[in-house]
Amino acid sequence: MKVGVLALQGGVVEHIYMIREAAKRLGKEVEVVEVRKPEHLNSLRAIVLPGGESTAMYKLGKRTGLDKRLKEALLEGLPALGTCAGAALLAREIEDKQSGKRYEPLLGVADFKVVRNFFGRQRESFEANLNIKGIGTFRGVFIRAPVMVPLSPAVEVLGEFKGNAVMVKQGNIIATSFHPELTSDTRIHEMLLSEAS
């Protein structure tokens, strides 16, 4: 099966490696596609939206029409994992904790709000053990991390840190505040591949 990684900007290589490792653990044959143009979405069974800079990713995608096609695919049920800035791409609402500024939604396909820089800027990056529903203990790497605020009962909180949602799921969409690709633990990527089957 083909699994894509949005490859406009951000942590692409790390996600490609983790998808391949997760596939090995699950005994699945996976071809990883770097998604840069609308046609790269053809025949994908799942996609990862990596961390990086959500606005930059969106603007680059808009130039080729990738944004519209990706939004359609997600609304049609393409399983997706959005990590950090990737979660912001998916969110219906976005605001910055430091400035209070609200931003226009980018893809806006999931019923949660992303509060950017919730735990502070780059120097406030940290790691913490999380209890993830269906997975158990998972080491979360937080870098300029947001939190997610569910805006509908359709959004299930899978993990929290200090009472704030840091991993959520709505239908075909999984979003994390942290970076699972920066660990050696493939279980969140395995969750995505299981959704794609």
From Swiss-Prot:
One of its GO terms (molecular function) is glutaminase activity. Pathway: Cofactor biosynthesis; pyridoxal 5'-phosphate biosynthesis. The active site is at residues 84, 179, 181. InterPro entries: Class_I_gatase-like, PdxT/SNO, PdxT/SNO_CS. L-glutamine binds at residues 52-54, 116, 143-144. It holds the Pfam family SNO. SUPFAM superfamilies: Class I glutamine amidotransferase-like. This is Pyridoxal 5'-phosphate synthase subunit PdxT. The gene is pdxT.
